[in-house]
UniProtKB/Swiss-Prot annotation:
Dually phosphorylated on Thr-183 and Tyr-185, which activates the enzyme. It is found in: Nucleus. One of its GO terms (molecular function) is MAP kinase activity. Responds to activation by environmental stress by phosphorylating downstream targets. Its EC number is 2.7.11.24. The keyword Transferase applies. ATP binds at residues 29-37, 52. The active site is at residue 147. The lineage of its organism: Eukaryota, Fungi, Dikarya, Ascomycota, Pezizomycotina. This is Mitogen-activated protein kinase. The TXY motif contains the threonine and tyrosine residues whose phosphorylation activates the MAP kinases. Pfam families: Pkinase. GO terms for cellular component: nucleus.
Length: 355
């Protein structure tokens, strides 16, 4: 094992990486709440990789996210989902306090791409197509990603796209009480479907489809469509564009409190997407309209979206693989998460790495 200190662009502190001597650590490429990502070279093969160092053991929530991430990224084997090439095995359980995931190195992410350049219509088509292609695999496995946003779509120079960060993912099949969902739901609200904010007893695959709609809108215009400052502002921005829900959609909202809240708001007329996106093609706007349907029941599915004429240049039903449904016990730890101590979660992570 070698301890390497990659150069830190902020210069504020040293970051130590306890990884195998097979890896030559290069630069810090990203930093999050409980992890750092460095680029590295795998010396035996010369392959460039990303090494994600995670220190999750201070918080149960970070442990849960790490466990979900490891289990799901190992489960999926898909061109548009980031893969784990290896996980650094710790020396022993006693000294185990960091997790190192070795992954494919991607050059940038959608958030940076949108901020630094105008994306062509062809780029938008290809990126949304790849996102939906990944989502088809997830949804066929009965997995909801729940945190799709531009920074979780990794890109390289060939315009290959890979979805990452499965820390909030959940089984779509488990409809046990989801009230714990919001406590852990620290995801960016800008890409959150309206039904998540209006009631959190049930959520479906349609929440991911809404996020794809928000991402497409942002790629087309270069700025977020619904940049809410808080819960109320978020809903207001959505209704400012989509208009007050129809009676049918209004009664589709399960929660009485949520219905009363909507009723208390002033009536809004729908703003035509053509007004918001004057330079965008009719086909792109038609898909956007279907992705951003207020009522999740009326929202387009991933399979339907892949067949939409806007994506026709890329759609190939023979090359859009599904994944087998995840077994019932796959998310067992999530069912018992409120009763698991940090030590028990650490043991589960250790077992997952060592398997």
């Amino acid at each position: 094992m070698s301890r390497s200190n990659p150069p830190n662009p902020t210069g504020s502190r040293k970051i130590s990486f306890n990884v195998s001597e097979q890896y030559d650590i290069q630069d810090v490429v990203g930093e999050g709440a409980y992890g750092v990502v460095c680029s590295a070279i795998h010396k035996p093969s010369g392959q460039k990789v990303a090494i994600k160092k995670i220190t999750p053991f201070d918080h149960s929530m970070f442990c849960l996210r790490t466990l979900r991430e490891m289990k799901l990224l190992r489960y999926f084997n898909h061109e548009n989902i980031i893969s784990i090439l290896d996980i650094q095995k710790p020396r022993n359980y006693e000294s185990f306090n960091e997790v190192y995931l070795i992954q494919e190195l991607m050059e940038t992410d959608m958030h940076r791409a949108i901020r630094t350049q105008d994306l062509s219509d062809d780029h938008c088509q290809y990126f949304i197509y790849q996102t939906l292609r990944a989502l088809k695999a997830m949804h066929s496995a009965n997995v909801l990603h729940r945190d799709l946003k531009p920074s979780n779509l990794l890109l390289n120079a060939n315009c290959d796209l890979k979805v990452c960060d499965f820390g909030l993912a959940r089984s779509a099949a488990s409809q046990e009480d989801n009230s714990g969902f919001m406590t852990e739901y620290v995801a960016t609200r800008w890409y959150r479907a309206p039904e998540i904010m209006l009631t959190f007893k049930e959520y479906t695959k349609a929440i991911d489809v809404w996020s794809v709609g928000c991402i497409l809108a942002e790629m087309l215009s270069g700025k977020p469509l619904f940049p809410g400052k808080d819960y109320h502002h978020q809903l207001t921005l959505i209704l400012d564009v989509l208009g007050t829900p129809t009676m049918e959609d209004y009664y589709g909202i399960k929660s009485r409190r949520a219905r009363e809240y909507i009723r208390s708001l002033p009536f809004k007329k729908k703003v035509p997407f053509r007004t918001l996106f004057p330079k965008t093609s009719d086909l792109a706007l038609d898909l956007l309209e279907k992705l951003l349907a207020f009522n999740p029941v009326k929202r387009i599915t991933v399979e339907e979206a892949l067949k939409h004429p806007y994506l026709e240049p890329y759609h190939d039903p023979e090359d859009e693989p599904t994944a087998p449904p995840i077994p019932e016990e796959f998310f067992d730890f999530d069912k018992h998460k409120d009763n698991l101590s940090k030590e028990q979660l650490k043991q589960l992570i250790y077992q997952e790495i060592m398997r």
